[in-house]
Amino acid sequence: MFEMRYVYLFAICIKFVSSSELGKINNLLQGRLIYTDNSVATNVLESKFPFLKSTCVKDALKLFLPQCIANGLESIDAETRVETAIKLSICEFQASGLGEIPENCMVDDLGSMMDCMFELESSSQWWTTYSGNYQRLSSICYENLLPFEKEQILKLFLNITELYDSFGDDVDTKLNHLMFQMEQDSQNFLDDLARMFRNYDNELRNATESNRIILENDLSFFRNKVNDVLYETSEQLEVQIIEKNSQLMNEVDTVHHIMSDLADELAKNDIKSKINDLKDDSLNNLQDLVEMSNDVKEYYSRNNKLVNTELENFSMGLKKQLGGMSKDLSESQMEAIELLQGFNSILHDSLLPSMTDEIVPEMTNFKNTLLQEWTAITSTLNGDFALWNEEIFSTFNDISEKLNGTKKKLDDIEIRVSLVHKNVMTMMRVLDFMWKTSKMIIRCGYLAVKNKYYWLLCSVVWIWSKYRTSRVNVKMIPIKRYYQWAALLLSIYLGAKTGSLIDF
């Protein structure tokens, strides 16, 4: 990450110092090689480089020496030679302490120089000095070649140093402007990114709130519907149980009356007809009970199917809504990821190649200096980028936590729906168990009524309860009672053997 930012900054800086800037720098360098500019302190340079000190001989050779070294002595015109020889002669006169110097030779003018020559001819000493200097111009040219080259090299170095100084100032200005522009662009990008995430968060909140309201309404409607169905079922079951209980009590009373009548008939010896009538009535009543039990069973089966259908429809609807919400959430996450990937691809595929292609070979020599100057800048940028990364990561973590909270709420709703379904199924199993128990009791009663031994046992119990006495003395029972008991036992035995008395 650090290397990518470093290359990115280096490419941006190099972009601003590209072809047009290099052309300006080349022109400026050529101009400084031709036209000298003493921008460095003269005293310091003359103390470090004595050959730079201004002397009379140096001033005299100022025009002659560059042309002679560059193009040779033959390229110099006669006027320049004469002027140079005159100036060298004047320098010798001044160095020797000669008091009388021609006045026309002290003026730097072509007409004065001609007058100066006429005056030099007037004195043999002056003319000899002038003639010797004129003849030594070729040797003077080669004798001053090395000092002249040193001076030119030093001037070139000073020009390059000044060029580097101005280039550094330009680079600092460009970097400051670039940093300011980058900060503005980064701030605008962060503002746009924060605005985008706020809009995304608001949309996600609104969608979650609307889905939560829809789910709550559906759950409330289903709960009310289930409560209504259960309430109606419980009321109908209670009414039917009360009816069955009353019918059972009536049947018990009827059986009790029948048993009383049977006892009376037994006393009157009219048993067979009463038993047959009782049998027919009991069969009819049991058939009615069986039909009613079948009706109740069909009613509960219909209610059970209705409740199961409602639960299945609600479960399917809830699964579809949860699937739609999960799909929307996944699509939103994919859009955010595609946006970040698009920004990353734009950065790596468009910006970096276009900037790195403009790096010119001439800037390679400046890389080490720029690296040292940019170390402090990169450290500051690293802190800023780290802070931006932390803010972006914290925003993503908040969004992930909110999504996890929404998922937990949906899981809680699903658990509650499963608990409601479980409670309804438990209630249905309890009702089914009650129905099976009541059916078994009715079946046992029906089988008991049909069994001849049950009637025999009831008859014995009834007779025993009717004729029992505390501590009966056998001797006190009359003989008539023995005959009656014997007749009763004989009839019971014969009925059990032949099946003619109690038969279906």
From Swiss-Prot:
The keyword Nucleotide-binding does not apply. Glycans are attached at residues 159, 206, 313, 404. GO terms for cellular component: endoplasmic reticulum membrane; mitochondrion; nuclear membrane. Residues 1-19 form the signal peptide. One of its GO terms (biological process) is karyogamy involved in conjugation with cellular fusion. It is found in: Endoplasmic reticulum membrane; Nucleus membrane. It is a multi-pass membrane protein. Induction: By mating pheromone. Expression is directly controlled by STE12 as cells respond to mating pheromone. InterPro entries: Nuclear_fusion_Kar5. The chain crosses the membrane at residues 453-470, 482-502. Residues 20-452, 503-504 are lumenal. Pfam families: Tht1. Residues 471-481 are cytoplasmic. PANTHER family: NUCLEAR FUSION PROTEIN KAR5. Interacts with PRM3. This is Nuclear fusion protein KAR5. It comes from Saccharomyces cerevisiae (strain ATCC 204508 / S288c) (Baker's yeast). The lineage of its organism: Eukaryota, Fungi, Dikarya, Ascomycota, Saccharomycotina. The gene is KAR5.
